[in-house]
Amino acid sequence: MLDVNFFDELRIGLATADDIRQWSHGEVKKPETINYRTLKPEKDGLFCEKIFGPTRDWECYCGKYKRVRFKGIICERCGVEVTRAKVRRERMGHIELAAPVTHIWYFKGVPSRLGYLLDLAPKDLEKVIYFAAYMVTWVDTEARERDLPSLEAQISVERQHLEQRRDSAIEERHRKLEADLAELEEQGAKADARRKVREAAEREIRQIRDRAQREIDRLEEVWNRFKNLKVQDLEGDEQLYREMRDRFGKYFRGGMGAQAIKERLANFDLEAEAEKLREIIRTGKGQKKARALKRLKVVSAFLNTRNSPMGMVLDCVPVIPPDLRPMVQLDGGRFATSDLNDLYRRVINRNNRLKRLLDLGAPEIIVNNEKRMLQEAVDALFDNGRRGRPVTGPGNRPLKSLSDMLKGKQGRFRQNLLGKRVDYSGRSVIVVGPQLKLHQCGLPKQMALELFKPFVMKRLVDLNHAQNIKSAKRMVERARPVVWDVLEEVISEHPVLLNRAPTLHRLGIQAFEPQLVEGKAIQIHPLVCTAFNADFDGDQMAVHLPLSAEAQAEARILMLATNNILKPSDGKPVTMPTQDMVIGLYYLTTMKEGAKGEGRAFSNIGEAIMAYDLGELDLQAKIKLRVEGDTVPPVNWEPPEDYQPGQPYILETTLGRYLFNETTPEDYPFVNQQMGKKQLSALVTELAEKYSKVQVATTLDALKDAGYYWATRSGLTISISDVIPPPNKQQILDKYEQQAQKIQRQYERGLISDDERRQELIHIWTKATDEVAKDMEENSPPDNPVWMMVNSGSRGNPLQVRQIAAIRGLVSNTKGETIPRPIKSSYREGLTVLEYFISTHGQRKGLADTALRTADSGYLTRRLVDVAQDVIVREVDCGTDRFLWQEIGERRPDGTIVRKHNVENTGFGRTLAEDVVVDGKVIATKLSDTTEALIDKLLAAGVTRIRIRSALVCESKIGVCATCYGRSLATGKPVDVGEAVGIIAAQSIGEPGTQLTMRTFHMGGTAGQDITHGLPRVQELFEARVPKGVAPISEVEGRVRIEETDKSRKIIVVPDDGSDEVSYQVPMRAPLLVQDGQRVEVGQQLVQGTVNPHEILRILGPRAVQQHLVSEVQEVYKSQGVSIHDKHIEIIVRQMLKRVNVLESGDTKLLPGEMIERPKFEEINRRVVAEGGQPASARPVLLGITKASLATESWLSAASFQETTRVLTENAIHGKSDPLLGLKENVIIGKLIPAGTGMPQYRNIRVEPTEEAKASMYSVSSYEEPSEYTFGQGSGEAVPLEDYDFGSYNR
């Protein structure tokens, strides 16, 4: 077999008949599968052992040769080679067809490649292939021209002959009529009888005339058709064709079916055709030019590759190996078989019947029908259902053809190549393990024993607890006591991977050190739940075991939970104390007025703890405490006058706060404040930035332990009586009810419109709700458990408390519009029937939304991953001098400079493109990382915008460079070469997708257009779709004139430079953003609404469209409170703008209208210019992520994404080769991915031994030393035991 590591690219092309025969190990001649009695394969059938290899290892069909010692012998009785049975997975066969057939992909795909090549409409092509019309394949024009006069003479002679025959027949009839009439006259018949005879004669004469005329017309028709006959003419009239062939058969040839197509292809002159098409493109216009371009693409594909167009017509069909289309016996003695076997059987049956008919010399019409059926059978085998009705199996189920095997989620690509089942894995329900350290997980004993079985068995043998592997296995299966001790030993320091589906981002798989636990549930650390999005209501998780030392090292260094504290999407910590822990720490750090022991002073912490233990001091009482000098004072602490650092000092604090500070690192300043969720978040962020991973993990564990400990002791409970309703609710509502009635009266009098009434009512009731909520908050005691939860941030928010305690407020209906009457009851009071009904309405919609959203969001992630999967950091610096301007601050009206609100997602973690110089002094040097500190320093120096590097300006040929990408947000350090930043970007954008809304909001009632928000808006942007209700932007600089008629409204821009004015038709109701007479810039938006990104690209260029897309996507995520760094969106946008569309081809081989990647285009141009030619011109195009994924250089990646058959057809014709640069391609063929430790520069490292090592290696071993070769000769490859040959040992 081919070793996957020894090739760098993979080419796809068209197989010729010779290729197919070369792959084949024999011809399949019979449709039989296996013998019903012996259950052995039939000879020459679809499972034949002679062709495909033996069904059992080292055993021929007849049983003459058994055992491995006969390896390679071909049995003379049955012709089967003695070898391994697994060759039945790789040996192919073939079927020699009695008549050629066309390949359905190339004839039926859109566009039809065969049709483009031969310049035939697919309808006509179908007529020829399926024997409904004849096609002329060759005309001897010279001979025809030469013999035309003599042929014409022959025809005219024949015509005269026909005319003479007609005239004599008519004359004959006339004579007979005369005789008949004379006879009747003699007999004295009546006039009536005479009239009848005369009429009959006239009728016959008319018939003679008509018949003759028809013959003459037919002759004329045949002659005219022949005179103008040219290659590729179709003739559907069989009679006419036959007559033409009988008369002028030596001047032309024609045929039906694939044979005719094959002849046509054999004589097809590609070069001449290409020249002709280029001429049309140079001179032609419109439709004609467009068609010529499309045809030239196909023609030049065959010209420039090794493919022959003959490959589109097959003389033989390959038969895939039998183990890939197996036949298995079910319990009931019946057989289950792959659909392919049925499809192959139909092909073989029809092929054999056709052979027999040809041998018998059957009439042409019968043979043609059989040929058509053979063509249809092969079509069904390749792609069932592509043409006509699909072939169905039992129960009217369409059979799965070869194409279906590749397509879709269940196809070969997505089911078996990109995702595989993993050995050494298990899954179980998860429960919380509060006693675990951050890097640990609890693994059930039974599960651990099964996972680590081989390790335990080996260790048992090493420790002499078992004699051999077999007895060790028995010991493990019987779970002897010694086994558990060995398991403990084996398991220590051996990390396992835990994964929770759906794995939306890379934190969905993390490594932990297993701890053995009783029971059957996996225990996980409470702090990693956020990353996994896990809860303990029945979630399950999977465990995987890294086997090799390298895998264990990578799991420990890169994937251990303690190394994954920051979120890759925005660099914020993801392991945060939540819920119980927050409430415990909040309780611990609260300072309570008038608590027991308030105002006392303690000389050291021991005294305070003793007082607490004796019940003399409350945990939350305000005390004075003498603190040792090695404790860093609080940040804003003002020291006494003669204070020296290192001296003890006195702090006003509580015992609880001191205990809280025991959890933080030694040198962290004393925290003397109440710690809620926000404060804890800030604390963890600071720790992650300034301290080592070990210290952060220790602190987090200490915080977790303290949180649970004090949450337990806080005695926090909740009951309905803790929900305190606001005392003045009724008075407030009455006051606003009067205002509402006033508005209603104004409306009834017609003073305001319905729209205004709605707006006013909504405004009034919003104010009322807010006032009731305020009243509620003012009347809630600080130690109220419900409010403690809300204020600490551990659970719930004021809105929810408001709905339970005070007032439900305004709700929306199913359309998403707000209903202008509020729900005045709270949940505590209970809702009336009407209130209940209108509130369930909106909530039900919300639930339905969530279900749809999950699917949509998953598909978006899949497309994003696909478009960005080959963006890997490939080099340290691409050396570009391009940059982006990034705002980091804004000037207030009073002159002070403040930070821009979202700097942490725009300017933070970037690389400076230039030195920042203020007043001749360099504040920040080029290529430095913009940290929080540096941004503050720049703002202090009065700098509000900086030049940064970004993925959008990176000039790396493949992937991006580390400098342009900047800091890796997951580690807080500069990104490493080999980081798969494209995948991280896709995950960061896709993971919060489920949190986005689905709705289209309505702007105030009926008027105004709908604005797309949430997930649909993100999809619209990434797919580069033209939005609904698109707003025009000005193409020129100038003044605006607005013209309105009754029906329409126009905005006209009069350019300053006096060129033609540009007019834009806008909807009557659309709100304008410009006034009459206003000056507008190029690219300024004229109407409210969404802008078409393609227009921005056309008018303002790539940079503007990049910034538009990034900011618009950010808008959606920001509105939902999701924080994502710009660099992730920039990577996706970079992929969307990677290609250019060729306008003029110059002297290059490119075709106008062709899409090509920019670096490749520039390189082609450079080459042509160097040779003194004319370069090509192109314009940038914006592709949606689906289109961009399908347009990738890698055909493997595109085929495994969507439209598999189309991608493979297209790329096979162009003979594309896949450079294997992305991740997917390498996963598919089973190579190491070129990212992370799989990068070549990390793989190609050799460790040189030291001099001593070399010396000891080359020294001669003395006889006491064991010999080096204790094992037999052979490779160091592991041999599976069941395959190992133990000589004559009879298994």
From Swiss-Prot:
GO cellular component: DNA-directed RNA polymerase complex
This protein's UniProt keywords: DNA-directed RNA polymerase, Magnesium, Metal-binding, Nucleotidyltransferase, Transcription, Transferase, Zinc
The record's free-text note on cofactor binding: Binds 1 Mg(2+) ion per subunit. Binds 2 Zn(2+) ions per subunit.
Class in the EC hierarchy, top level: transferase
Binding site for Zn(2+) 2: C878, C954, C961, C964
EC number of this enzyme: 2.7.7.6
GO molecular function: DNA binding; DNA-directed RNA polymerase activity; magnesium ion binding; zinc ion binding
The keyword rRNA processing belongs to this UniProt entry's keyword annotation: no
Residue sites binding Mg(2+) per the record: D535, D537, D539
Cofactor(s) of this protein: Mg(2+); Zn(2+)
SUPFAM superfamilies, alphabetized: beta and beta-prime subunits of DNA dependent RNA-polymerase
Keyword GTP-binding appears in the UniProt entry: no
Protein name, UniProt field: DNA-directed RNA polymerase subunit beta'
Gene name per UniProt: rpoC
